[in-house]
Amino acid sequence: MPAFHHHDLGLLNPAFDSPLVDVVTELEYLRRLQLGGSTPAPVFFQLKHIFHMLESLGSARIEGNHTTLADYVESRLEVQPARLSDQLREMANIELAMSFIEEHFAPGQDLTEHFIRELHAMTVQGLEREGDDNPGAYRQGLVKISQSEHLPPEAVTVPQYMGELVQFVNHPHPAKYDLIKVALAHHRFAWVHPFGNGNGRCVRLLTYTLLIKYGFNVKAGGRVLNPTAIFCNDRDQYYAMLGKADAGTLEGREAWCVYVLGGMLDELRKVDRLTDANYLIERILSEHAAVSQALDVTAL
């Protein structure tokens, strides 16, 4: 039976030979990332646009949204789309919130609870199945988390925990801790589960906000990194790793950080390969053309 167990929010100081040190060291270059390569810029940005749609679809899929890619693309291509279904609006809200973050949050800016609540309000706005009766307001009752043995804290303690979280991310720790703080803050938010619904979508938006806050150049190349891509690839692993961190042990929290930051590193490597025209032609475009040709032959 799910149960609540308090544990303090604090930094990790991994051993020098920890995998966490390795992944943090490799990711530090993201602060000064400048994309370049042999892929023509228009082609690269078109591909990134496609990935943005896939990432929004992936974020919604984690929450159980089963909209197909074809339906989502069709809704985006319509000049004057008909009234969006609840599931399509859910993804449109995510994209709108991502743009809001990029326009209204700058490196070094302090995070506020008001900003977090604003993200939540945008995420659930106009939704029925995955909406919230009180957009932007902390929950007033108990909630349970799907596939989790962790029971979030009582509603009366949510403001205290969220105030603590905001203070933690804004505290001027040495920059070497920034990436670790991004991962820890993601888990802590999920652990608190401050809203009645939409917590998963909101925390992934918060993670993107924190990367910008700490000066990581995630907006380069048309949003080079969206944390959603990390978590939507394997929903079961996402919940399993959250479960490890829920225990509050140093080992569990460190394993969570390695999972999150390792996923970011993998996504950056994928983007880097897209800037290589030879890789793009040989491994993506040519294979896609071959599959399309085979389908055409089969249809005949």
Residue ranges and their predicted role:
Residues 1-300:
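FIC/Doc superfamily catalytic core
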